Amino acid sequence: LSDYALCVSVMKNTKAFQNVLEIILDEPIDLEEVKVEDVILHSRGQRAIRLDAWARSSDKRQFAVEMQNDTEKDDVRKRSRFYQGLMDVPILKSGKQTQYRWLPATVVIFITMDDIFGMDRAMYTFTECCRELPELELGDGVTKIFCNMTSKNGREELVSMLQYMKRTDLKNPDITDRSD
């Protein structure tokens, strides 16, 4: 599934996309809308992003999942920042009508072949918090998650899914069966 075309084909299926999110987030998700290869233009039309897979849940959270095989070409961390910012643009109205409280919680997930942080974790989850009071979260509703197919340190179901994405073969010894 690390192949872009195969990944997008699978994510078109709402149930498959929902399963991927449920495994990564370790919580039940009810998806209402799914889009693949969705293009979001910057308001001035100068820059755009093409989301591999996007979804909205029944609790109005929005999710973007990006498969990033080559992490050497670009800074995936900064790319996640840009993606998250542009995902908010279509939701906001210009001028005095802007009401930021209507921005939905947003989860941006990058799945990479390599561990871009080099700390040997299958998943890294980031939310913004105060440097002086680390227990104080900003509460802006943004979560950025970086999963990788290199490390096997993480929840068994997550590692199994990532290993399956890395080598999509039922004979892969690093995957476990997820019974529904």
What is the role of each PLM region?
Residues 1-179:
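Elongated, amphipathic alpha-helical interaction scaffolds
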